[in-house]
Amino acid sequence: YKRQVPIAPDAAPLGTAAEESRSIKAVAKRFGADLVGIAEIDLRWHYATRVDVRDFSKAPNELPDGMTHVIVMAHEMAPELVATYPSALAGAATGMEYSHEAAIAIQLASYIRHLGYDAVASMNDTALAVPYAIQAGLGEYGRNQMVLTPEYGPRVRFSKVFTSLPLAAAAPRRLGLHDYCQSCTRCADSCPPRALPFGGPEEGGDSPPTIRG
């Protein structure tokens, strides 16, 4: 995560947590996010350590004190480019959305800090995006190992903003997508390196790689 601007010394007056959640979602969409959800911070999804890029050593992966919620944003990838996978154009769609989401997350974190509350923007660092996106009600986990959203399917990238702003967390939604994946194997059948599982989800034990060659 990164801090971009100082926290305003005087906190802005707030409404209820539900009101602030609606407001912050509207602001995030104004900045360019396509989907927005909110979850309580759950340390199960956080990386144990991070890499200090100055010497590539392990460093503690700790958020600032007082963080209580994470705002999860989904960013749609261009369908006409994604449809060309595997190609350089599809790779460009990925890179373009990473740049886009970084700008949006930093803007939202800066906005919250101007309100007088702490906020840090995060992309792929700090914590896993997939379980947080599910926890924030943005979609369900699919056989393809991705979050399936009802609006865009898996064609999204995620960013996060950790914050101390009092918000109301969403609940995971049962959309029927996860259940559908239990009987459908179309993505696994179509995967050239056979990297996707055919059976149902399992918990615990080793997870041997399915890629051959």
Task: Describe the role of every protein-language-model region.
Residues A8-I41, W45-A48, A105:
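Phosphate-/polyanion-interacting regions in eukaryotic proteins
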Residues D34-G213:
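Catalytic cores of enzyme domains
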